[in-house]
């Protein structure tokens, strides 16, 4: 139960942070490009890398709680792209280049395809 509460609390913080970055990006740069999402994804990747290294070096009994709160919760609420980026980086570090290429290519193409599928289904169901 503790882990669920950590995920929920972290997710709330991450989601609020994502929203605030999006609002600020819109205010600063306008709406002609998805600056907020781009900034969140790049920042999320950087923060996930810092977190992964910190957790690996830190160790200790509370390591799992920090991972759940910050990695799953905060970063999950902030951007799931950071988890995708970490998984890809780990594959590359293991020299699993084909796996990393397949994973990144399939993730991007199939995610965009899934969006179109969802749009199509919603339009048919709701006659939008």
Curated annotation (Swiss-Prot):
Membrane topology: Multi-pass membrane protein
Activity regulation summary: Na(+) is not transported, but it plays an essential structural role and its presence is essential for fluoride channel function.
Annotated TM spans: 4-24, 37-57, 72-92, 101-121
Keyword vocabulary terms for this entry: Cell inner membrane, Cell membrane, Ion channel, Ion transport, Membrane, Metal-binding, Sodium, Transmembrane, Transmembrane helix, Transport
Keyword Coiled coil: no
Catalytic activity, reaction form: fluoride(in) = fluoride(out)
Gene Ontology CC entries for this record: plasma membrane
Residues bound to Na(+): 76, 79
InterPro entries in alphabetical order: FluC
Gene Ontology biological-process annotations: cellular detoxification of fluoride
GO molecular function, one term: metal ion binding
Annotated localization: Cell inner membrane
Entry function: Fluoride-specific ion channel. Important for reducing fluoride concentration in the cell, thus reducing its toxicity.
The family this protein is said to belong to: Belongs to the fluoride channel Fluc/FEX (TC 1.A.43) family.
HAMAP family: FluC
Protein name according to UniProt: Fluoride-specific ion channel FluC
Organism expressing this protein natively: Caulobacter sp. (strain K31)
Gene name of the record: fluC
């Amino acid at each position: 139960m503790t882990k669920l509460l950590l995920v929920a609390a972290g997710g709330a913080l991450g989601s609020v942070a994502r929203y605030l970055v999006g609002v600020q990006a819109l205010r600063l740069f306008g709406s002609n490009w998805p600056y907020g999402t781009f900034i969140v994804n790049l920042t999320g990747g950087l923060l996930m890398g810092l977190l992964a290294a910190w957790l690996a070096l830190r160790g200790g009994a509370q390591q799992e709680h920090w991972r759940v709160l910050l990695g799953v919760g905060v970063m999950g609420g902030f951007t799931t792209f950071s988890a995708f980026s970490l998984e890809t980086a780990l594959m590359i570090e293991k020299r699993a280049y084909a796996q990393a290429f397949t994973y990144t290519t399939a993730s991007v193409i199939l995610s965009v395809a899934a969006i179109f599928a969802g749009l199509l289904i919603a339009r048919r169901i709701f006659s939008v």
